[in-house]
Amino acid sequence: MELMEGLLTRRSVRKYQDKPIERETMMEIIKAAQYSPTAHNRQPWEFLVIDDREFLAELRHIQRWTSFAKDAACVVIVCGDTEKSFSRSKEDEKWTFIDVDCAIATENLMLAAWARGI
């Protein structure tokens, strides 16, 4: 898939095929997220891949907009580590970049999955 095609055709998916994702494919997708740019190259994230069906069904009790996750082959949770993240204090404000860094990694992850037909 060409980059522009992926950018212009990517969409949010809430209905999933009943088909597992190969471990090698999942590792390639995670690698794409790990190559995302971050503030000062801190890479303040961890990626948790959850494929346990019972746990996925319970996610709806943790986060209210995740009821569709029970039907997914897996869910990747992107966790940001505030200790690793770059931050800057300026006057009376503290600027942190963890949300931006994790959002960029998540977008890379979604585009990599989309490019592989997932």
Regions found by a protein language model. Name each.
Residues 1-74, 80-81, 85:
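N-terminal amphipathic, basic helical "cap/leader" segment at the start of enzyme domains
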Residues 33, 76, 91-118:
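Small-aliphatic-rich amphipathic alpha-helix that forms the alpha element of a beta-alpha
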Residues 86-90:
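Short, conserved acidic/polar surface loops in the N-terminal third of protein domains
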